[in-house]
Amino acid sequence: MRDVSIIGVGITKFGELWDKSLRELGLETGLAAINDAGITSNDIDALYIGNMAAGSTLQQEHVSALIADYCGLANQNIPATRVEAASASGGLAIRQAYMAIAGGFIDVAVVGGAEKMTDVSDSESSYTVSMGSDEQWEAKAGATFTSLHAIIAQNHMLEYGTTREQLSSVAAKNHYHASLNPMAQFPFALDPAAVSKSGMVSTPLRMLDCAPNLSLIHI
């Protein structure tokens, strides 16, 4: 196995990016990552894009080839692969590229995670996200990702004695990290007490425990 390094990055701001299409965001971040790495398109052996929802929210499948085309990589004749694993799609795309490079199959990969979740209504995006659950036994029964994670949290509390204060500290920690990132959707810190006092969504998860809908691309 060979060592693998991340040599360049490009990222959009996290949030409601209504003024730009998925392909425009892909072009912006793809070129930024390539320039940051100091490479050219001739150096790239493969493209991996993690995406869950474009087929539902944008009626656009085959997004890896779309982004390759708009980034000027189509003439390089490299494999462009879409990776889907619900909310972990971007992370799994990194894993696939890592395995290909570490195994010696390729030398350089462009890897990205891309979603446009705010171009549709909240109900439509919630329905799309619920497709990542079991359609027959969970989604059809009305389960959402939030309610399923609430059940997981309840079981964790029962098994390990996890407290409300500990759950709030997780959200507060995440918001603190966001306060250090100018590209974050909500770049400000939160006190754990504010998390505990926010509105209930699905017991025991409150509003500030839950991830908001957003659009972004990072490569």
Where are the language model's segments positioned?
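Conserved catalytic cysteine-centered active-site region
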Residues: 2-5, 54-109, 116-148, 186-212
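Generic N-terminal amphipathic, Lys/Arg-enriched alpha-helix
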Residues: 3-18
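Short, well-ordered amphipathic alpha-helical segments that serve as non-catalytic structural scaffolds
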Residues: 23-38, 63, 67, 93, ...
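Phosphate/pyrophosphate-binding loops at sites that engage ATP/ADP/AMP, CoA/4′-phosphopantetheine
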Residues: 31-45, 156-161
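Beta-strand segments within the central parallel beta-sheet cores of soluble alpha/beta enzyme folds
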Residues: 41-51, 78-85, 109-113, 165-172
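N-terminal leader/propeptide and maturation segments of large enzyme subunits in energy/redox metabolism
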Residues: 143-195
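Conserved small/polar residues in nucleotide/adenosyl-binding loops
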Residues: 217-219
